[in-house]
Amino acid sequence: MNSTLSTCAGILLLLACQNKQVREQLPVQANDNLIGKIERYDPSAILLIDSNARFEVIGEKYTWSEGPVWLPNENALLFSDVPENKIYQWKEGSGTSLYLTPSGYTDTAKRDGENGSNGLALDKNGRLILCQSGDRTVARLNSPLNDPKPAFTILSANYQGKKFNSPNDLVADSKNNIYFTDPIYGLPEGEKDPTRELKFEGVFRISADGQTSLLIDSIPRPNGIALSADEKTLYVASSDADHPRWFAYQLNEAGQVKSGGILLDATEMKSKATVKQGADGFKLDSIGNIYSAGPDGINIISPEGKRLALIRVYGRSCSNCAFNTDKSNLFITADDIVIKLALHPK
């Protein structure tokens, strides 16, 4: 390369680096391309998400958005605002509206901490099930989805007579067994909260007949949770501040853990991130890839634990995500906003 070409190349490289820095310093704004961008690290990601995937803010001014779930029969999205003890609904054409309150703390006594519902899911009968952070229970909404009322059936409130810490996220299988995580995030004083009864943070299973069993007690800050399509693998995210990780466990026919361990360690990923958060809530696509909130946004991870791509969200911590029915859109809860991401815009 001659000196002139070398100089030009250097200038172009410098400009590219400066432009990249400028883009990453831009504030997050609604309804434009400043919300985030797509970064693909593996050729297979080309089929998963378009580089021009379209970001759109569909809700804003929440305290902490969480736990999104898609309602196929209603063609609607539900999500929690945990500190505000509310669930909101979004529908195409009509926007976002308050869906249910109270959602996770039903007592009238004043209580600090994260009181509302957190993770939301549907059971095999299409009923809404909730992690109630304030009440420290896993519950089911009694009313129809199209006419919600704040009345609940408690599915589990304790393990061996001791109250849960604060159920965080959950998933139901095809037989109506429910798997959920129970970190200390919803306790007003965390680990040292005087009302804490369990000495550990666990991953639990509620059987279809209502029996609660402990599956795992060794994961610090267990958070997001999901099942593989064949329901033979249970995935769990750890949002531990020092060592965020994703775990994969093989289940036996009785739904108990028979083997498993770390799928992907995100410690280094977090150390290099702009938004330094742990692994949080996630969902699986139709071929088993994990779309998980984590360092810098939504990380797309293969079933083998390879990071395929990143849906980078500027300036905000993402908490969870959910697909619509045909998986053309991914909805992302991110701090005070909710994002709709068209994965393959036309």
Q: Could you say what each language-model-derived stretch is?
A:
Residues 1-25:
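Bacterial Sec-dependent N-terminal signal peptides
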Residues 18-346:
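Sequence-structural signature of mature extracellular/luminal beta-sheet repeat domains
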